């Protein structure tokens, strides 16, 4: 099965950059598996939010990539942005720890919302390795082929762009390092921010390090303070 490019609802610069992926047979297989999954049960996020990260952060605006694993699998959580939940939804433990690190790193007080749209609009691509998941079943769509697609996203960004900061937290994210040209981009690694993860996330200072790198390469730093974002 081949996907009709006109049916792919994604921001135009990404549609052009990823055209070869959308027209490939594996992407058609992803679509078929999604159709079957939706017939069998609930899929997160809603269809209109699957490409939310791309729609909020056009290809040429990407400054930072924060790689997650797969969407949250509880009701009303997933919004197509890694680690992010809609305003009003309880902030997940991993994001609580991210906020704690930002406070320790930059002195920014922890916000009341888990919505990371403000970061996305500044050029932070909040990318999950898998873009969909079945309700209450973590990693249930990991065999759909999404990682072929998101690996291609990373490779294309690495090849076509310069001076992007890749924040890779946890071993699955660190496994993506070979996809990135480290001569022209900055890769920062740490343990996953989940309370269940082993290793050090706290003290990584990735947020100040990111901004230092961006500033050194004549790019506007990220305002990590979500308290400045009006929902």
Curated annotation (Swiss-Prot):
Keywords: Cytoplasm, DNA damage, DNA repair, Hydrolase. The keyword Metal-binding does not apply. Its EC number is 3.2.2.27. One of its GO terms (biological process) is base-excision repair, AP site formation via deaminated base removal. It comes from the Bacteria. The keyword Signal does not apply. Gene3D superfamilies: Uracil-DNA glycosylase-like domain. Belongs to the uracil-DNA glycosylase (UDG) superfamily. UNG family. Excises uracil residues from the DNA which can arise as a result of misincorporation of dUMP residues by DNA polymerase or due to deamination of cytosine. This is Uracil-DNA glycosylase.
